[in-house]
């Protein structure tokens, strides 16, 4: 397991500059064949946790919410699941309001391009276009990853996290499933 925080920690990340090939090389991603890109630490567990048990994932979080607890939980998840991870430092909130990443999209795209083209990924996984339950960062992550994935690849190995359902509609959803 490896993650990066500009120090030999379990998770790589916490940065003010762009992701570099040299930095990705330092993570020794040879055993990682799958890429998971999420908006926040804990999204990898909530939306993609079962997949992490398969190992071989490089998990990238776009923001940590400047939250030490979430960083530590991410590090522990990556360590315990035997995967590798990177936390970037794009803003979660600005002046108490959720950031729309307006001034950061070009930088996010540059980082996504570096990561997506770093090596051949057998699978790329991210938030679904609806942002699971409509979270703006999940929606934007999905949109940016999808855009850059198809700009760089001509294949269909991009996958989205499943649909989120509110508790009150679960019986209706369950009744629509095949037995």
Stretch-by-stretch model annotation:
Residues 43-47, 66-68, 129-134, 166-169:
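Active-site environment of divalent metal-dependent phosphoester hydrolases
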Residues 1-4:
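Short, small-residue-biased leader/transition segments that mark boundaries at the very start
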